[in-house]
Amino acid sequence: AQGAKPGEGGHLPGKKVYPWIAKTRCSIPGVTLISPPPHHDIYSIEDLAQLIYDMKNVNRRARISVKLVSEAGVGTIAAGVAKAGAQVVLISGHDGGTGAAPRSSITGAGLPWELGVAEAHQTLIQNGLRSQVVIEADGKLMTGRDVAIACMLGAEEFGFATAPLVAMGCCMMRVCSLDTCPAGIATQDPELRKRFSGKPEYIVNFMYFVAQELREYMAKLGIPTVDRLVGRGDLLQVREKLVTHRAETLDLSVLLQNPYGENVPHFDPAAVYDFHLEKTADMGILMEKLGKSLKSKKSGRLEVQVSSTDRAFGTLFGSEIIRQCGNELPE
């Protein structure tokens, strides 16, 4: 999902598909590449749950994140994602996204992250799932004020992309899709890339300023930590005397409701979804019988009776082989 162009997939214009890009993507130089937006292995929450389970078997230490575009009803989807075992639900707003997206998508598709974050947060609380997942917000977050608002609406993590790009030298020429970026960022042209003058320290400094502004807002509100700010929509106020009369007719009370006061439910590491991987056949049989052979990097043989309830059989053990032996076969 992408907030800038939901349902359209990623676009890589043919002009930017240089030979080394084409080789990586198994394509032909100069051919436009469009990533298909639908995931044909995910047509239901059950399909998503199976994929998350498979990924968790591949890497037990992984924190699985699912990205959702802010839209009406995203709270229901977020609840399903939490039940499927994801640890992070990312709500992506319409303002952000790649500069190579079609202009019609950038200006006319998607909804603000504020609506999606508030709905997801409140729906997860109503279903008793809020402590299981982290809510992350992204989509043109630019300042500490944006972070404070996102936090008060229910987010615990925050994604930045456009603002750090500007800190690295992006001058917002809106030519990301043309391979003519004058700052040398959104281009594969070797000559233009020489113009890139960004440094990691620039982003570090920018983030320090964002954090400082957030601290100032928290001080004004009397909030000591970010955790205490999560979900405090009651601290937000609707602006009055807006420029347009149409905006004054909006009712934002649903977004700002908080019946929990200072004790707003939010992510608790102790309540993370338990996949019970220790009960799988991989851990109970393969690791038990072949663990010593794995540590000594010797071959082993084992006959196991597998049933349909042994999902992703061999995946977890295979991940341990790669972790200990690397992903290349010995010469």
Sequence positions of predicted segments:
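Mobile "lid/hinge" segments at catalytic clefts and subdomain interfaces of large enzymes
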Residues: 1-29, 154-244, 248-249, 253
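Conserved catalytic alpha/beta cores of large enzymes that bind or transform nucleotide phosphates
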Residues: 7-8, 18-55
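Terminal amphipathic helices with adjacent charged low-complexity linkers/tails
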Residues: 13-16, 67, 82-98, 223-280
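Short acidic (Asp/Glu) and glycine-rich catalytic loops that position anionic groups and cofactors
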Residues: 28-32, 57-58, 96-100, 185-196, ...
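Glycine-rich phosphate/ribose-binding loops and adjacent secondary-structure elements
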Residues: 39-194, 309-310, 314-319, 324, ...
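Charge-rich, low-hydrophobicity low-complexity segments
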Residues: 247-331
